[in-house]
Curated annotation (Swiss-Prot):
Coiled coil: none annotated. This is CinA-like protein. PANTHER family: NICOTINAMIDE-NUCLEOTIDE AMIDOHYDROLASE PNCC (PTHR13939), NMN AMIDOHYDROLASE-LIKE PROTEIN YFAY (PTHR13939:SF0). Pfam families: CinA, CinA_KH, MoCF_biosynth. NCBIfam families: cinA_nterm, molyb_syn, PncC_domain, PRK00549.1. It comes from the Bacteria.
Length: 413
């Protein structure tokens, strides 16, 4: 099935808004075993939209359009759709009834501008929008199934999931079904991962492997398309053990899980507790720990000791040590971790100190220098790193590196 997506909006072309809708549509369709083969972006220009539809429709089985369905003068998608398909623009009574009910239930007045949102191409099928005023709709133009959705991401996502994916799947020819499996990796580059999995697709009939970088992790997506659910599941089940064997312990999570949820699960399973002392990450590790519901069962506390005085007063880092070694050093990281464990009384304590930039680096300790320390009842270990990138990238990769160290430590507990 050949599918295209079309995003509409001047704000997209100007770079004022990132087009997350196109990515979400492509990813969701891929999960359903469908591939988007082409994507276009045009501005809020009726002629440009009509031309784009005229180009895409004859070459595709389905085109999914987002944007331009609002109540303002620059929302011209419905008019362009009517022109492109040779239909009249008519007041859709079902859409108007829905809109009246939408406003009535909220105690709001229905404005004429909102009523214009119900002017749709003749014989358009409605796509329910529970979250907003824009009327989604679909048309059959020749052999092409045209779908029109609002550009508001939350509205689009719900309509995509509840209505559009089932509609598109119903139009797919053949009984093929798709199963997928997702592995999240940390510690290897995309090229290194590809090298380890080289040849696996050729040796496993029907198995497809794709790679997606979501810095600083990489996702490996296994996909099997077959004539039955059982056959597709069998292909995935046969490929997963081989992938796990080749990738080993760089796999940090599977399915919808993340490294954050993997660490949370291990803390609960092992019955251990954690304290954090952060400097250059500014609480980012603690945020990721507490983003997982139920983390209070194992996370005692997190201290952001950014200034040297805070390291001294709250963690007991000796003033002389800071003066001699500097705040960014293995010795200070070790003292921070030991101090955090002492203050919290936790089983484990992790500390981080480093230079995230853009200033503060030197020849001996350039920007990107980071020290992590992990203390437990047996002692304290320190690791040093030289990360590259801008400030946010250095802080992010530091936080994930810390979580991965916790994950590996818990696996051996």
């Amino acid at each position: 099935m050949k599918i295209a997506t079309l995003s509409i909006g001047d704000e997209l072309l100007r770079g004022e808004v990132v087009d997350t809708n196109a990515a979400r549509i492509a990813a969701r369709l891929a999960d359903a075993g469908l591939a988007v083969g082409r994507h276009l972006t045009v501005g809020d220009d009726e002629g440009e939209i009509e031309a784009a539809l005229g180009m895409l429709a004859p070459a595709h089985d389905a085109v999914i359009v987002t944007g331009g369905l609002g109540p303002t003068d620059d929302d011209v998608t419905a008019r362009a759709a009517a022109r492109a398909t040779g239909r009249r623009l008519v007041l859709n009574e079902a859409a108007l009834d829905r809109l009246r009910d939408f406003f009535s239930r909220r105690g709001r007045e229905l404005y004429p501008a909102n009523e214009r949102q119900c002017l749709l191409p003749a014989k358009a099928g409605l796509i329910p929008n529970a979250l907003g005023t824009a009327c989604g709709f679909h048309l059959l133009h020749g052999e092409c199934f045209l779908v029109f959705l609002p550009g508001v991401p939350a509205e689009m996502a719900r309509m995509l999931e509840e209505s559009v994916v089932p509609l598109v799947l119903d139009r797919r020819s053949g009984p093929e079904v798709t199963r997928t499996a997702v592995l999240t990796l940390f510690g290897l580059s995309e090229a290194e991962i590809g090298g380890r999995l080289s040849g696996l697709e050729r040796s496993r009939g029907g198995l497809g492997i794709a790679y997606c970088v979501d810095f600083p992790v990489v996702q490996v997506k296994l996909r099997a398309t077959a004539r039955s659910e059982e056959e597709a599941a069998e292909i995935i089940a046969g490929g997963l053990p081989l992938v796990r064997e080749r990738l080993g312990d760089v796999i940090v999570a599977e399915g919808d899980n993340t490294i954050d949820t993997a660490v949370a699960r291990l803390f609960r399973e092992k019955g251990l507790t954690l304290a954090l002392a952060e400097s250059c990450t500014g609480g980012l590790i603690a945020k990721r720990i507490t983003d997982v519901a139920g983390s209070s069962a194992y996370f005692f506390m997190g201290l952001v000791t950014y200034a040297n005085e805070a390291k001294e007063r709250l963690l007991g880092v000796p003033t002389a040590l800071l003066a001699e070694k500097g705040a960014v050093s293995a010795d200070v990281a070790r003292a921070m971790a030991r101090g955090a464990r002492h203050v919290a009384g936790s089983d484990l304590a992790l500390a981080v100190t480093g230079i995230a930039g853009p200033d503060g680096g030197s020849d001996d300790k350039p920007v990107g220098t980071v020290y992590l320390a992990l203390a437990d009842r047996a002692g304290c270990s320190v690791k040093s790193y030289r990360f590259a990138g801008e400030r946010d990238a250095i802080r992010t990769v530091t936080a994930v590196t810390a979580l991965d160290w916790l994950r590996r430590r818990l696996l051996t507990a």
